[in-house]
Regions:
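Conserved alpha/beta cores of soluble small-molecule-handling proteins
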Residues: 1-165
Length: 165
């Protein structure tokens, strides 16, 4: 079964999903993300994720392209059409693209943010060995930048840390 994803207002088969190569999220990690767990087909702490999303967007002076109510509806629809009982929904909003690569932020009045959402099915997530017994972790200095409170898509260093563990 092909997974259904959400891109800029449209529900699409994942094989048809496209984002511009000039999108600032791709070129500059200029975006934020949230991951909402799904257990027993229910969203876990959606309100907390929506609040943090709004705060992160505000800290980056990014426009939110979707209302909280519509965001909840998209989450529920993705859970329904993808038949997710245990898993997650990944959401990413980027500043979008106004054409060529540039360090200056594009005009928010003329540039539409990009929003992408997809599900991951994780059957047995709550009963996994890591959930039951824990997982090996290490502590490493976070050298990303001084604004770790903003949940950006800059995840290379945490990925490297996971590989070190």
């Amino acid at each position: 079964m092909t997974r259904t994803v959400y891109v800029n207002g449209d529900y699409l088969p994942e094989t048809e999903a496209k984002v511009s190569i000039f999108d600032r999220g791709f070129l500059m990690a200029d975006g934020v993300y949230e991951v909402t767990s799904v257990l027993d087909g229910k969203l876990i702490d959606f309100d907390g994720h929506a609040i943090r999303l709004e705060r992160s967007l505000g800290e980056l002076d990014m426009r939110n392209p979707i209302t909280k109510e519509d965001l909840l509806e998209v989450h529920r629809e993705l859970v329904r059409v993808n038949e997710i009982n245990e898993g997650l929904i990944y959401l990413q909003i980027t500043r979008g693209s106004d054409g060529d690569r540039d360090f200056a932020f594009p005009d928010p009045e003329t540039t539409t943010p990009t929003i992408v959402m997809f599900t991951q099915n994780k059957p047995g997530m709550a009963d996994s060995p890591a959930s039951q017994k824990g997982a090996k972790v290490i502590s490493i200095e976070d050298i990303r930048w001084g604004r770790r409170d903003i949940k950006t898509v800059q995840l290379l260093y945490p990925s490297m840390g996971k590989m070190m563990a």
